[in-house]
Amino acid sequence: MQWLHTLPPPLQDEVAALISAVPQAAPTLDKLFEYASNSPQKQKIPDPPRKKRQQTSAPPQLPPPLTQADIIFHLSNISCQSPFRKRLGFAFHLALGPQGPVPALSLVNNQLQPEFSLMNLGQDIVFCSLLPILGNSTVSSKKDTVLLLVWLAHGDPIVCQLNFDAVKKQLVAEGKVPASAESELDSESEEDDAEGIRPINEALVDFLVRQFQLCGIRLLNYLPFSTGSKNKLTLNKDTALALSTNGTSVNDVVIVQAYRGSKDGALVLLGGTQDQPGTIIFGFRKPILLFRANSVKRISYSNITRLTFNVSVTVHNDTRPDGEETIEFSMLDQAYFQILDDFVKRQGINDDSFNEALREKQKADPNVKAETDAEDAEAPDSDDEEEDGTYQAGVESDSDNEKKEEDGEENSEDEDSEDGEESEDSEDGELSEDGESDDLSLS
């Protein structure tokens, strides 16, 4: 039984126990082993099939680099958040169209190879603006880092953060801005602690607006200025800001922190111009919703408490059976209710807050709940950002407030002061060393 040692140890023990109990079985086991070893019909367990390696597709072939002769205007190494989250160049350049050279817009790498291009600017671009960033506008070292938003007719928008200090250095190095311009403009400014961007950066904004105009694109400027009589902040908090483009008390821009589902973002309301209707934008790390004010059928307020309120916006949507869609934003700070409501009224949007039939319809509408649930279940981004925290605190109802006031009115003043401090101190937002936010693109 020399073959016994070739068996696995547990099987050796079993065979040895069998032979010990039935010694006459040993010859039979020898014959069985010999037959199994030499028989051509022996059974072998096939090896499991190897998984075929997934052949990774080759990276897409990039177009040839742009030549300096083709470039109209180029901002290098800016922080893009959409459609790619990486540092790229933002370039207007000439491209060959059916009827000859036409202006095009591309996001390019360091070798000036386009990684994303728009060849028909008039049809591809819906809306283009410069916007302040919540949390940056209240900090002097960060207020000159702003948002460049290019909303497209199809696909994700182009979202870039512009650090005007970096833009200034590039343009000075290229000889497009005099090296003495900064000191000359700063000396003319009388306000050292102004809330708006620095005078040199105001000049850079005007330069950018002209470059966009050369390519047939209107760049709307909603950045607060420190000089002149236009673009003045009327409200500047970490969680909300308001701006008048005419330097009056009438706000043309309102940006407030809001929630959609459990995700917090920024709700941006922009007033209309002579040739463009007002615009409403909302986004988390990047804008995900944009619709014109003239597409809004009505707006309503709900869950109004001492601290917060919700706002529901109903817009035209031909894909829905009833031709409309309602989007709800929640947990807006009650301190900003009047500013937002005044803006809505000036835009001529119908306030339907007291329509009981509408309230019941919203409660029963599965689309509203489905969209909210979808936002709650949204997978985290694949980049290195920290995951958004999920807001878990309950909304305090009016009946709860009344009960608390009856149980202990002596504590109301302390609670009010604490609540106010928490509201103003929240959501400061961390920034990278170059002053650019690694988190929310709008807030």
From Swiss-Prot:
GO terms for cellular component: chromosome; nucleus. Interacts with histones H3 and H4. Residues 358-372 have a biased composition (Basic and acidic residues). Keywords: Chaperone, Chromosome, DNA-binding, Nucleus, Transcription, Transcription regulation. Belongs to the RTT106 family. It comes from the Eukaryota. GO terms for molecular function: DNA binding; histone binding; nucleosome binding. The keyword ATP-binding does not apply. Histones H3 and H4 chaperone involved in the nucleosome formation and heterochromatin silencing. Required for the deposition of H3K56ac-carrying H3-H4 complex onto newly-replicated DNA. Plays a role in the transcriptional regulation of the cell-cycle dependent histone genes by creating a repressive structure at the core histone gene promoter. This is Histone chaperone RTT106. Residues 38-64, 358-443 are annotated as: Disordered. Residues 373-389, 407-443 have a biased composition (Acidic residues). It is found in: Nucleus; Chromosome. InterPro entries: PH-like_dom_sf, RTT106/SPT16-like_middle_dom, RTT106/SSRP1_HistChap/FACT, Rtt106_PH.
